[in-house]
Amino acid sequence: MANELTDKAFWANYWESKKGLAFKVPANYTFHKLLKNIVDEQHPESAVELGGFPGYYAIFLKKYFGLKTTLFDFYVHQKVLKEVLVANELTEKDIDVIEGDLFNFQPKEKYDLVLSCGLIEHFNDTKDIIARHLTFLKPGGTLFITLPNFTGVNGWVQRKYDMDNYEKHNISSMNPRALAQYCRELGLKDVTAGYYGKFSVWLENRDEQSGFAKAFLKGIWLVGKVATKIVPVESRRLSPYIVLKATL
């Protein structure tokens, strides 16, 4: 079985079909508190975002913390990248960009912080794709990985309304306990893994849904938001993300 659940053609079509990609990355961007804690505690000077096109987190870390950042992906749409950089008052000189295959690339540079957000769940061998991150990481550096949680309500929404997208994800990778164990087996320290965030659901193909489906999904979203505001718990059923952090 091939390790990758997607290919370059999938991502080319994906990015060319997306609208509104060129926005100003805000200071309160998703996971901003967690990344600020890493910066405050570990004081990284350099970071690489793997599989992160169009580089929102590389941009975030550059803009708000002054890190020397690199974007690595096996597909980079140059027109989209330039538009996103311009929207954030940056140029191609501000963010290093490497277009390459993670499975046959040997990095010439190591980084204090290696992060990926929404990458590892697109591969069948979860431990192997985590190990690929470590080739970029300096000794003592921090690994930060996030992925969506499709094992709860949001996963039901994906299966019901966008099975094609659901099947592009390795659902078995969405297990914090297993992720933590893989990291320990790979020699990482200070490993933490868990569900993250208050309730949310989304659909990549929302614009294609019927009016009834959109209204139903909005109802689910509102009920979940109210419930987690009353009882602000992070759990497998309700949290939209999983976060993994460790040091080498």
Predicted feature locations:
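A short His-aromatic
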Residues: 118-122
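Conserved N-terminal segment of class I S-adenosyl-L-methionine
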Residues: 1-109, 113, 117, 130, ...
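Short conserved AdoMet
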Residues: 62, 66, 124, 138
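S-adenosyl-L-methionine-dependent methyltransferase catalytic module, highlighting the catalytic core
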Residues: 7-29, 74, 79, 88, ...
